[in-house]
Each structure stands twice: as structure tokens, then as C-alpha cells.
UniProtKB/Swiss-Prot annotation:
Keywords: ATP-binding, DNA-binding, Endonuclease, Hydrolase, Nuclease, Nucleotide-binding, RNA-binding, rRNA-binding. Residues 710-785 form the Smr domain. One of its GO terms (biological process) is negative regulation of DNA recombination. This is Endonuclease MutS2. Endonuclease that is involved in the suppression of homologous recombination and thus may have a key role in the control of bacterial genetic diversity. Acts as a ribosome collision sensor, splitting the ribosome into its 2 subunits. Detects stalled/collided 70S ribosomes which it binds and splits by an ATP-hydrolysis driven conformational change. Acts upstream of the ribosome quality control system (RQC), a ribosome-associated complex that mediates the extraction of incompletely synthesized nascent chains from stalled ribosomes and their subsequent degradation. Probably generates substrates for RQC. PROSITE patterns: DNA_MISMATCH_REPAIR_2, SMR.
Amino acid sequence: MNNKILKILEFGEITDRLGALAITSPAKERAEKLLPSSDFDQVQNDIKQTLALTNLLRIKGQLPLTNFKDVRPSTKRLGVKANLNAQELGNLLLVLSLAQEINEFLEDVDEKVDLTIIDPILDQLDVPDLLFRELKKSIDYDGEVLDTASSELARLRHDIASNEEDIKNRMTTYTKGNSSKYLSEQIVTIRDDRYVIPVKQEYRAKFGGVVHDQSASGQTLFVEPEAVLNLNNRQQNLIAKEKQEIRNILKHLSNIAREDIDSLNNIASALTSLDFLQAKAKLAKEMKASEPKLTKDHSLNLRNARHPLINPEKVVPNNIRLGGDFDTMLITGPNTGGKTITLKTAGLLQLMAQSGLFIPAEEDSQVGVFEQIYADIGDEQSIEQSLSTFSSHMNDIIAIMKNVNSETLVLIDEIGAGTDPEEGASLAISILDFLRKKDAKIMVTTHYPELKLYGYNRPRTTNASMEFDLKTLSPTYRLQIGIPGHSNAFAIARRLGMREDVVKNAQELMSDEDSDINKMIAKLNAQTKAATTARNRLETSLDRSQKLEQKLQQALDWYNQRVQKQLDFAQERANEIIAKRRKKADKIIEQLEQQKNVGIKENKIIEAKGELNSLERQANNLAHNKVLQREKRRHHVSIGDRVKVLSYGQTGTITKQLSEHEYEVQMGIIKVKVSDRDVERIDNSQSTAKPKRLVRATSAVRRSNAHSELDLRGQRYDEAMTNLDRYIDSVLLAGLDTVTIIHGIGTGAIRKGVWQYLRSSNHVKNFNYAPANEGGNGATIVQLK
């Protein structure tokens, strides 16, 4: 992308804001160098990564990051066998610690946050165990070598502290005792890394030892008394050994780090990438920006787009479209109406999207991925070259014409301005014709009325204007696509009190062609406002319809789940009954087998036959059980079958199998998605029979089979809660509004369980104790939604 467009559209302001939101120095540097990409796949990947961090930031919160220095200079030194200093190793420890913390942070991320797109980055956060362990034991983030780095270092530091205490105690005898009168001040200080006292010059001989320094006046000598010479010598020796031990430790740590140069570089790079992406996510949140959708035909559809550098409380959102029905847009009208800002908004949002940033526009806004974006906006004449505004303008356009192609977005402010209006308009038309032949996407602003007709008589070209409020005599800054702009001079003059005869005379002086154009524009304005009002009404109605459809689908899904639950329960009960009867039948047969060789009384045989016949009848009853029959029928439907959709009470034809248990059914002119539990296959004989008028009596039938009262008295707690759950399901299916739960008073356990269940249920509107004459505290009245 050319640097000029970045400057014209103030892209640097965006990268500055991005860098300010980054935490680490490498990420800030990366933000400052951010440039738009012209590679579609790269842009798509960048936007998806920004989306991943946006979701993570919204759901989980900010990554545990803090600032660290670039590790590349350190790893480069390791590569040439150099040893690192303590500060460099402390920075490496910080980098590894951050990687470890982020790994732990992401361990319990909500499954709703899809981080697949950044897996290659996260895979680099593999912390080398040995290096991390040794660094953590030996050094802190500021580069301070710890006592735990080695046992020798710990011993030396203990000896240093002990010897230092001895020195201070010895020196205290000089500052606190009789010798203090010979001192300039009663203090102990250090010169040349040795402890000394400030002795008055005339009392030098009182102390012996070594003079290390003197004051500027020469009146004070800094003397190391002879009594502490050995202690100071020992201290210096211990300190020298400590420094040597620290060098050994740093060398040891550097050798370990040298084995993990690639890992260190990868981890630092991954942390930088995560911080950079998180900064993008923060910027999106700050700007209330949304994910742009990419188009492969280079079309733009920015919905309620806002210029990101204008005060959010003052900026006016605009719908900006280019591509699709038209590739060239001419924005006409007077100055200060917002034409230039509209151009800059389209261009800057396009640059942001191609940089992997979210854009300040509504969701589902679309942008292309352009190879180049060119702009000629504002007066950029060069004083050094002594060029006029028009010459500078032409130089920019000539440069654009040399490079333009079908993958180019061209933005030109006041095309052809700065010269004779007639010549300028002709030149503007010719330039536009050339750019259109190159299949570029073009947005231009102009004052020339001749270009209003250009928008009508050229294919894939449209006019646009900035709306003007005649009541307030001020621009609204709203873009109107399809309507050319005009000056509104006569209307403004009238509003300001100009004499009517003067205004009318001015109107008569206009050419018929200009007058006709203005009338056409006024008519288009009225039609557009009417169309906008109608569209808003339709969008509102569509939104309501979609929400209603969603609610109905949710209700249908809930209904199917409840029906399935009831069927499963019925099947379970049937299986239990069959198992018990089989067990009893087997027992009877076994008894008969045992007694076949023994004389049996006739009445016993009759009783046994009666029991077997009874079991057979019960089995037959189960075989004819409507619930189980329906269950069986529902599992035997296929594409083309005529079925009855139970939830609608209507018939239709299965047109598609969506999944193992879901089908698409055509009912008249509509198609619905249903579960196999919600359909009954219709035999051909039934489908060819004379159609009957459908009567929706389902609710009435269900109500007749459902009781408005449930008695839980005398039941165990678990049994009562199970029965309560099943009862609520059944009354919901039956459509009852109010029911009574009798739980008694007793210990209160059942009542507490009932109330806890009702509080947690989404289907309960409210509940309270029954009136005194209907059970009082021993019963609860429940109102269902």
C-alpha cells in the first residue's frame, strides 16, 4: 500500500491509538509499523485472529501480560557464545513466566471462545522446564541474583553480612565513645568500598590507619582506622568472591539458555503477537467496532459507518455502498456538508479492515481487499515546486491513472476543481470515463452540475449527495445515495428573509435545463424519503417476524423435548410391566413343569390357565397401547411419506431428512422442521379418503386428561420430587394455567423441596400458599406461564 494514502487518510492516528493499547514494548513497536495487506487470505486470517481475542477479552478478560524487553538482542549474543548479564537473564525469566501464566489462564477458557485460529501462536508457548526452573531459583525479574542460586553464594553473603556487622560495631566505638570529639561528624561512611570515619585534620594521628580521601577544604580526612583494616580487607575479599560466584552462576544460566534459543525467540514472538492482537481487540471495544465481512468482488457495504477520529458524540453514521449495482459514485452538493469526510470514512475503514482491525460500523458491514487505494483529497500544493492547486491536483490524478486497475479503490475530492468550470467539468468527465474503463471502484466529490447528469447516463454509475435540512438551514451530514445534490440557495434565501420578488426573479433567470434538473432532484428527494420510511417499516416488521419465528421454534423445540420425555417414560414403564409379567409367566410354567408328573386338582389347572390368559391379555393391551403404537409408527417414516404433524394438526409430505431424527415437511406452501416424534405416517387409504374439516381439539383433550391438583402427602422426598417434575410436564402439555400442589405441613421437607423446584422452573409465573379454606400452608397454588 502506498505511503501517501496512509498519510492522507490519517492511518497513523489509528496505529498510534493501537500502540497505546499494547502492553509490551515489542507489541507497541509492531503496532506502529502496522500496514494494510492486499492479500485476501492474510486479511481474512488477521480479522479472524482479532475476532478470537475480542471474544476472549469479552468472556474471560485480559491476558496476564506485563511489559518485557525484546529478547532478540540477548538470544543473538547467546548465539555467538557470549554470556548474558543479570538484567538480560531476568528479562528471559519474565518472558517464560508470562508464557506459563497465559497457559494457565487459557486452561479453563469457556468452550464458546474458539481459539483455533491462534493455535499456531499458542503452540509456541512451550516453556523449557529446566531453564525456567533454574532461572526462577537463581534470579528475579529485575536481574537481582538470589541467595538460592547456589549454596556457595548463600554462604558468602552470610559471611559478608556477619563481617559487615563486626565492622559497624567496631566503628561505633569511634562515633559513640570518647574518640567522637575528634570527628567532624559522628557518622560512618564509605570511600573506595571501605568503611571510614570523618576525622578532623588536626587529630589525624589519634587514629592511625589509612587516609582514603579528604574534604574540599582539607579540614576533614576520611580515615580507615587501623583497628578495622583487617575487617575491611576481609570484607573486600568476600565481596570479590561473591562477584566471582555470581559470574559463575550467570555463565551457568547462559549455557542452559543457549540450548533453548529457538524456544525463547518463539515464546517472545508469541507473547508479542498475543499482546498485539489483544490491542486490536481493545481498540475494537474502545471504538465500538465490529468484524468486517470480506467480499471477493471488491464491493463495499458499510452500514452506519463512523469516522473513527471524530468525537463519537458528534459523528454522524452513514451507509456507504460501492460495487453491486454501481462501481462509481459522484457525491455532489455544497461545501461543509460532509462530502470529504464521507470519502475519508470509506477509505480509512477500508485501510483498517485490510490491516486486520475491526471497523466502526454495524455488524455484517462488508469491505473488499484492494491491491491499492489512491486518494486525492485536500489542497496539497507544494510551495517549493511553486505549483498551483490545479496543477497539484492534476499531478496526483495523473499518477493514479498510471497505476489504476480493477483491484483499485480511487477517492478524489473535488475532481476537476481549481480551473475554469466548463473546462474543469469536461476534464472531470473524461477522467472518470478513463477510470471506469479500468474497472476501478471510484468515489468522487464535485461542485459541477454537469456531473449530475453523468451519474444518470453512464452505466454502473450513481449520484449521491449530503442531506440538507431546510428547516434549520444546516447540513445533516447524512449521505443520500441515488440523489444528486443542489445548493438550496433559493430556499435558504427565503428562510433568511430575502424579498420574494428578488427570489422569483432569480429563479426565472435560471436556464430551463437547470430548472428542470432542480425539479427532478426535489422529486427524487421526496420519493427517497417516502421509500426510506417504507423500508424502515418493512425492516421493523421483518425484525418482529424473525423474533416471533425464533420464539415459535423455541416453543416447538421445547414441546418436542417434553413429548419425547413423556414417551421415554411410557416406554420405560411398559418395559417394566412386560419384564414383571414375563417373570411371573416363567414362574407359572416352572411350577407346572415341576408338577406335571403329580396329580393336580382341576381347579389349580384352571387357575394357572387363567393367570396365563391374563398375562396374554396384558401383553395384548401393551401391544395396542396408543403411546407405544405411535412411537413405533414415528420411527418408520421416510422421504415421500404423507404424515400428520401433531404439533400443527396438519398433514404434509416429508421432503427431506435433516438428521437421524429430524425431517423437513411440506405443508401447503410452507415448510417446517420437525422431529420424528412429532409425526404420524398416514396410510394411502387414509390419504385418499374424503378430506374432513380439521378441528384443533388437542388442548381440550389434554385438559380433560390432566388434573389441576397433585397430592404429594405420604410420599418420600425423592419420590415426591420425581412425581412433581412429571406432573408439571403433563399440565404444561395440557395447557393448564393454574394448579394446586398439596404437600401437607409435617416436617416441611416436601414443602421446601416443592418451593425450591418452583423457584428454579422457567415455566412458573408465580406461586404462594393456598387460602385458608383451600389448605392454607399445607398446599401451594401455582400459576404457569
